[in-house]
Protein backbone atom coordinates (compact mmCIF):
# COMPACT_ATOMS: atom_id res chain seq x y z
CA UNK A 1 0.00 0.00 0.00
CA UNK A 2 1.34 3.40 -0.90
CA UNK A 3 2.29 5.69 1.93
CA UNK A 4 0.69 9.12 2.24
CA UNK A 5 2.22 11.84 0.09
CA UNK A 6 5.23 13.33 1.79
CA UNK A 7 6.34 16.94 1.76
CA UNK A 8 10.12 17.02 1.65
CA UNK A 9 11.62 19.30 4.25
CA UNK A 10 14.90 20.78 3.09
CA UNK A 11 17.60 23.00 4.41
CA UNK A 12 19.56 25.04 1.91
CA UNK A 13 23.06 26.40 2.09
CA UNK A 14 24.15 28.27 -1.03
CA UNK A 15 27.07 30.55 -1.69
CA UNK A 16 28.40 32.35 -4.72
CA UNK A 17 31.99 31.85 -5.79
CA UNK A 18 33.09 33.76 -8.89
CA UNK A 19 29.57 33.78 -10.32
CA UNK A 20 29.28 29.98 -9.89
CA UNK A 21 26.47 28.97 -7.57
CA UNK A 22 27.27 26.00 -5.39
CA UNK A 23 25.56 24.51 -2.38
CA UNK A 24 23.67 21.61 -0.88
CA UNK A 25 20.06 20.64 -0.39
CA UNK A 26 19.50 18.30 2.52
CA UNK A 27 16.26 16.30 2.68
CA UNK A 28 15.05 15.53 6.18
CA UNK A 29 11.79 13.70 5.41
CA UNK A 30 11.45 10.16 4.01
CA UNK A 31 11.82 10.02 0.23
CA UNK A 32 9.41 7.63 -1.56
CA UNK A 33 10.35 5.40 -4.48
CA UNK A 34 7.79 3.56 -6.58
CA UNK A 35 4.05 3.60 -7.04
CA UNK A 36 1.60 1.90 -4.71
CA UNK A 37 4.22 -0.48 -3.31
CA UNK A 38 6.72 2.12 -2.17
CA UNK A 39 10.15 2.02 -0.68
CA UNK A 40 11.12 4.88 1.61
CA UNK A 41 14.62 6.27 1.84
CA UNK A 42 15.30 7.69 5.30
CA UNK A 43 17.87 10.50 5.06
CA UNK A 44 18.45 10.57 8.82
CA UNK A 45 19.83 7.02 8.80
CA UNK A 46 20.66 6.61 5.08
CA UNK A 47 18.62 3.41 5.06
CA UNK A 48 15.93 2.15 2.72
CA UNK A 49 12.69 0.95 4.28
CA UNK A 50 11.23 -1.93 2.25
CA UNK A 51 8.75 -2.92 4.97
CA UNK A 52 5.81 -0.92 3.54
CA UNK A 53 4.49 0.19 6.89
CA UNK A 54 4.98 -3.08 8.77
CA UNK A 55 5.24 -2.74 12.53
CA UNK A 56 8.06 -5.28 12.57
CA UNK A 57 11.22 -4.43 10.69
CA UNK A 58 14.41 -6.43 10.27
CA UNK A 59 17.18 -3.85 9.94
CA UNK A 60 20.36 -4.78 8.08
CA UNK A 61 23.44 -2.59 8.17
CA UNK A 62 25.75 -2.38 5.19
CA UNK A 63 27.98 0.16 3.48
CA UNK A 64 27.67 0.50 -0.29
CA UNK A 65 29.94 3.29 -1.55
CA UNK A 66 28.29 5.77 0.83
CA UNK A 67 25.02 5.60 -1.15
CA UNK A 68 23.19 4.05 1.78
CA UNK A 69 23.96 2.32 5.07
CA UNK A 70 21.50 -0.53 4.82
CA UNK A 71 17.85 -1.41 4.55
CA UNK A 72 14.95 -2.88 6.47
CA UNK A 73 12.46 -5.56 5.50
CA UNK A 74 9.30 -7.11 6.85
CA UNK A 75 10.08 -10.75 7.78
CA UNK A 76 6.44 -11.69 7.27
CA UNK A 77 6.49 -10.75 3.59
CA UNK A 78 10.00 -12.03 2.88
CA UNK A 79 11.20 -15.30 1.36
CA UNK A 80 14.68 -16.82 1.38
CA UNK A 81 15.14 -18.51 -2.01
CA UNK A 82 17.97 -21.06 -2.12
CA UNK A 83 18.83 -21.79 -5.73
CA UNK A 84 20.25 -25.07 -7.09
CA UNK A 85 22.08 -26.24 -3.98
CA UNK A 86 21.72 -29.73 -5.45
CA UNK A 87 24.08 -32.68 -5.55
CA UNK A 88 24.67 -32.26 -9.27
CA UNK A 89 25.98 -28.73 -8.86
CA UNK A 90 27.72 -28.79 -5.48
CA UNK A 91 28.58 -32.36 -4.48
CA UNK A 92 32.34 -33.01 -4.90
CA UNK A 93 31.71 -36.28 -6.75
CA UNK A 94 30.70 -34.19 -9.77
CA UNK A 95 33.12 -31.25 -9.67
CA UNK A 96 35.27 -29.06 -7.51
CA UNK A 97 32.92 -26.16 -6.86
CA UNK A 98 35.02 -24.27 -4.32
CA UNK A 99 32.82 -21.18 -4.29
CA UNK A 100 29.68 -23.28 -3.93
CA UNK A 101 31.12 -25.21 -1.00
CA UNK A 102 32.27 -21.95 0.60
CA UNK A 103 28.68 -20.70 0.44
CA UNK A 104 27.26 -23.68 2.34
CA UNK A 105 27.99 -22.63 5.93
CA UNK A 106 26.93 -18.98 5.51
CA UNK A 107 23.70 -20.15 3.89
CA UNK A 108 22.99 -22.56 6.74
CA UNK A 109 23.42 -19.67 9.19
CA UNK A 110 21.03 -17.51 7.19
CA UNK A 111 18.48 -20.35 7.10
CA UNK A 112 18.67 -20.64 10.87
CA UNK A 113 18.12 -16.91 11.41
CA UNK A 114 15.33 -16.88 8.82
CA UNK A 115 13.46 -19.60 10.69
CA UNK A 116 13.83 -17.65 13.94
CA UNK A 117 12.29 -14.54 12.37
CA UNK A 118 9.53 -16.37 10.49
CA UNK A 119 10.94 -15.86 7.00
CA UNK A 120 9.69 -18.52 4.58
CA UNK A 121 12.36 -20.86 3.18
CA UNK A 122 11.98 -21.82 -0.49
CA UNK A 123 14.19 -24.31 -2.33
CA UNK A 124 14.35 -23.62 -6.07
CA UNK A 125 15.89 -26.50 -8.01
CA UNK A 126 16.26 -27.93 -11.47
CA UNK A 127 13.74 -30.73 -11.81
CA UNK A 128 12.81 -31.86 -15.30
CA UNK A 129 10.64 -34.55 -16.87
CA UNK A 130 10.60 -36.43 -20.15
CA UNK A 131 8.06 -33.92 -21.43
CA UNK A 132 10.44 -31.07 -20.62
CA UNK A 133 13.21 -32.75 -22.61
CA UNK A 134 10.94 -33.06 -25.65
CA UNK A 135 9.76 -29.45 -25.53
CA UNK A 136 12.90 -27.72 -24.32
CA UNK A 137 14.46 -24.92 -26.37
CA UNK A 138 17.70 -25.82 -28.21
CA UNK A 139 19.77 -23.20 -26.38
CA UNK A 140 18.90 -24.69 -23.00
CA UNK A 141 19.90 -28.19 -24.08
CA UNK A 142 23.12 -26.91 -25.60
CA UNK A 143 24.11 -25.38 -22.27
CA UNK A 144 24.23 -28.88 -20.82
CA UNK A 145 25.71 -30.63 -23.85
CA UNK A 146 28.37 -33.24 -23.34
CA UNK A 147 31.77 -31.88 -24.26
CA UNK A 148 30.86 -28.26 -23.52
CA UNK A 149 32.28 -27.35 -20.13
CA UNK A 150 31.51 -29.84 -17.38
CA UNK A 151 27.96 -30.63 -18.50
CA UNK A 152 26.91 -34.15 -19.41
CA UNK A 153 23.54 -33.50 -21.03
CA UNK A 154 20.15 -32.93 -19.45
CA UNK A 155 18.42 -36.25 -18.94
CA UNK A 156 21.59 -38.31 -19.45
CA UNK A 157 21.84 -41.43 -17.32
CA UNK A 158 24.40 -40.88 -14.58
CA UNK A 159 26.39 -43.70 -12.94
CA UNK A 160 24.87 -46.13 -10.47
CA UNK A 161 21.75 -44.98 -8.69
CA UNK A 162 22.32 -41.28 -9.32
CA UNK A 163 19.49 -41.18 -11.85
CA UNK A 164 19.05 -39.15 -15.01
CA UNK A 165 20.69 -35.75 -15.03
CA UNK A 166 18.53 -33.22 -13.13
CA UNK A 167 15.37 -35.32 -13.44
CA UNK A 168 12.84 -34.89 -10.67
CA UNK A 169 13.16 -37.17 -7.66
CA UNK A 170 16.64 -38.42 -8.51
CA UNK A 171 19.64 -38.42 -6.21
CA UNK A 172 21.64 -36.03 -8.37
CA UNK A 173 18.78 -33.49 -8.34
CA UNK A 174 18.27 -33.81 -4.59
CA UNK A 175 19.53 -31.24 -2.12
CA UNK A 176 23.19 -31.46 -1.18
CA UNK A 177 23.39 -33.30 2.17
CA UNK A 178 24.07 -30.28 4.46
CA UNK A 179 20.90 -28.66 3.15
CA UNK A 180 18.84 -31.82 3.07
CA UNK A 181 19.65 -32.20 6.76
CA UNK A 182 18.06 -28.84 7.64
CA UNK A 183 15.05 -28.87 5.28
CA UNK A 184 11.76 -28.94 7.19
CA UNK A 185 8.18 -29.90 6.26
CA UNK A 186 7.15 -26.24 6.32
CA UNK A 187 9.66 -25.35 3.63
CA UNK A 188 8.53 -24.90 0.04
CA UNK A 189 10.06 -26.74 -2.91
CA UNK A 190 9.84 -25.47 -6.47
CA UNK A 191 11.10 -27.10 -9.66
CA UNK A 192 12.40 -25.11 -12.60
CA UNK A 193 13.31 -26.00 -16.17
CA UNK A 194 15.23 -22.86 -17.06
CA UNK A 195 18.01 -20.84 -15.48
CA UNK A 196 15.31 -18.64 -14.01
CA UNK A 197 12.58 -19.93 -11.76
CA UNK A 198 10.46 -16.88 -12.54
CA UNK A 199 10.65 -16.73 -16.32
CA UNK A 200 6.92 -17.30 -16.73
CA UNK A 201 3.85 -16.26 -14.76
CA UNK A 202 2.90 -19.95 -14.82
CA UNK A 203 6.03 -21.04 -12.96
CA UNK A 204 5.13 -22.55 -9.56
CA UNK A 205 7.34 -20.09 -7.67
CA UNK A 206 5.79 -17.16 -9.51
CA UNK A 207 2.27 -18.34 -8.73
CA UNK A 208 3.11 -18.83 -5.06
CA UNK A 209 4.67 -15.39 -4.65
CA UNK A 210 1.70 -13.66 -6.24
CA UNK A 211 -0.88 -15.63 -4.25
CA UNK A 212 0.91 -15.22 -0.92
CA UNK A 213 1.62 -11.51 -1.22
CA UNK A 214 5.31 -11.99 -0.52
CA UNK A 215 7.26 -8.94 -1.55
CA UNK A 216 10.93 -9.23 -0.57
CA UNK A 217 13.13 -12.02 -1.93
CA UNK A 218 16.52 -12.92 -0.49
CA UNK A 219 18.74 -15.03 -2.73
CA UNK A 220 21.37 -17.68 -2.02
CA UNK A 221 22.74 -20.50 -4.17
CA UNK A 222 24.65 -21.34 -7.33
CA UNK A 223 25.70 -20.37 -9.88
CA UNK A 224 25.66 -16.67 -9.07
CA UNK A 225 25.88 -15.38 -12.64
CA UNK A 226 23.58 -18.01 -14.11
CA UNK A 227 20.56 -19.43 -12.29
CA UNK A 228 20.75 -17.06 -9.33
CA UNK A 229 21.08 -13.95 -11.48
CA UNK A 230 18.53 -15.22 -13.99
CA UNK A 231 15.94 -15.53 -11.24
CA UNK A 232 16.91 -12.22 -9.64
CA UNK A 233 16.60 -10.46 -13.00
CA UNK A 234 13.09 -11.79 -13.59
CA UNK A 235 12.07 -11.04 -9.99
CA UNK A 236 13.23 -7.46 -10.48
CA UNK A 237 11.32 -7.14 -13.75
CA UNK A 238 8.12 -8.45 -12.17
CA UNK A 239 8.40 -6.01 -9.26
CA UNK A 240 9.70 -7.97 -6.28
CA UNK A 241 12.38 -6.59 -3.96
CA UNK A 242 15.68 -8.38 -4.61
CA UNK A 243 18.42 -8.93 -2.04
CA UNK A 244 21.54 -10.92 -2.92
CA UNK A 245 23.41 -12.55 -0.03
CA UNK A 246 26.79 -12.47 -1.69
CA UNK A 247 28.71 -14.92 0.50
CA UNK A 248 25.78 -17.33 0.24
CA UNK A 249 26.29 -17.53 -3.52
CA UNK A 250 29.10 -18.85 -5.70
CA UNK A 251 30.01 -19.57 -9.29
CA UNK A 252 32.54 -21.60 -11.24
CA UNK A 253 32.73 -18.91 -13.92
CA UNK A 254 35.24 -16.88 -11.97
CA UNK A 255 35.53 -14.01 -9.54
CA UNK A 256 34.83 -11.46 -12.25
CA UNK A 257 31.42 -12.99 -12.92
CA UNK A 258 30.60 -12.89 -9.21
CA UNK A 259 31.63 -9.25 -8.95
CA UNK A 260 29.69 -8.24 -12.05
CA UNK A 261 26.53 -9.88 -10.70
CA UNK A 262 26.95 -8.13 -7.36
CA UNK A 263 27.43 -4.82 -9.16
CA UNK A 264 24.36 -5.28 -11.34
CA UNK A 265 22.16 -6.19 -8.39
CA UNK A 266 23.37 -3.43 -6.06
CA UNK A 267 23.32 -0.75 -8.77
CA UNK A 268 20.17 -1.61 -10.69
CA UNK A 269 18.05 -4.36 -9.18
CA UNK A 270 18.11 -4.17 -5.41
CA UNK A 271 20.56 -4.72 -2.61
CA UNK A 272 23.64 -6.81 -1.84
CA UNK A 273 24.56 -7.83 1.67
CA UNK A 274 26.27 -10.64 3.60
CA UNK A 275 25.27 -13.48 5.86
CA UNK A 276 26.93 -11.67 8.75
CA UNK A 277 24.84 -8.54 8.24
CA UNK A 278 21.72 -10.69 7.96
CA UNK A 279 22.43 -12.80 11.02
CA UNK A 280 23.27 -9.69 13.08
CA UNK A 281 20.21 -7.78 11.87
CA UNK A 282 18.23 -5.93 14.50
CA UNK A 283 14.48 -6.37 14.90
CA UNK A 284 12.84 -3.02 15.60
CA UNK A 285 9.88 -2.35 17.80
CA UNK A 286 7.06 -0.05 16.65
CA UNK A 287 8.33 2.89 18.70
CA UNK A 288 11.86 2.85 17.33
CA UNK A 289 12.70 5.79 15.12
CA UNK A 290 13.69 4.12 11.88
Residue ranges of model-derived segments:
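A short alpha/beta connector and helix-capping loop motif
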Residues: 76, 93-126
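Asp-based phosphoryl-transfer active-site loop
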Residues: 79-86
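Short beta-strand segments at enzyme active-site cores
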Residues: 82, 119-132, 245
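Catalytic metal-binding/acid-base residues of hydrolase active sites
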Residues: 86, 127-129, 223, 249
Amino acid sequence: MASDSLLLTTTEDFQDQNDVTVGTIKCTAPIPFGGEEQWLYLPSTKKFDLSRGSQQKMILDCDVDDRHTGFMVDPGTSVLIVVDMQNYFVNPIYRHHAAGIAAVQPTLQVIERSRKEGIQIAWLNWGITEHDIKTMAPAIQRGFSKGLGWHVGLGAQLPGDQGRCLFKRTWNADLYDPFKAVALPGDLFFDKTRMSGLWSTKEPLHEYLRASGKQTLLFAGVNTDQCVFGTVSDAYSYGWDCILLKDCTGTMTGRGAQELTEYQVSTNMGFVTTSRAFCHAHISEPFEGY
